[in-house]
Amino acid sequence: MARKKEFKYRGYTFEELINMSLEDLSKLLPSRQRRSLKRGLTPEQKKLLRKIRLAKKGKYKKPIRTHSRDMVILPEMVGMMIYVHNGKEFVPVQIREEMIGHYIGEFALTRKRVQHGSPGVGATRSSMFVAIK
């Protein structure tokens, strides 16, 4: 029977990450995320964190929706369902331990994969001689 491997981020367990201050945690993050946190959180990001903390306590009942795609995923967000705007609609994102240190926007894709239809008449040389439906 295979045991689930314990999650570690840069050698620290999830419990250790939760107990860390934001300053200590930022030292573990990649440079882009570290600089983003060092500049300080925007008012929208602070509002999102406030909603997440209220939801964890059970005081915020509505689904958490955000346009703030540039928010770095912190350990206190793990386990939450956040609806992230992709430019058209809000995409549900379940925050997992493996996502710590990434941006929320990375998990709500802004572009859809192209699904081309069948080519029209005259699209290729051989299709000129195909009977029209």
Curated annotation (Swiss-Prot):
One annotated GO biological process: ribosomal small subunit assembly
Organism domain of life: Archaea
Annotated InterPro entries: Ribosomal_uS19, Ribosomal_uS19_CS, Ribosomal_uS19_euk/arc, Ribosomal_uS19_SF
Keywords: Ribonucleoprotein, Ribosomal protein, RNA-binding, rRNA-binding
GO CC annotation: cytosolic small ribosomal subunit
Pfam family, one: Ribosomal_S19
A GO term for molecular function: structural constituent of ribosome
Family of the protein in this entry: Belongs to the universal ribosomal protein uS19 family.
Function: Protein S19 forms a complex with S13 that binds strongly to the 16S ribosomal RNA.
HAMAP family with a match to the protein in the record: Ribosomal_uS19 (MF_00531)
Name this protein carries in UniProt: Small ribosomal subunit protein uS19
Classification of source organism: Archaea, Methanobacteriati, Methanobacteriota, Thermococci, Thermococcales
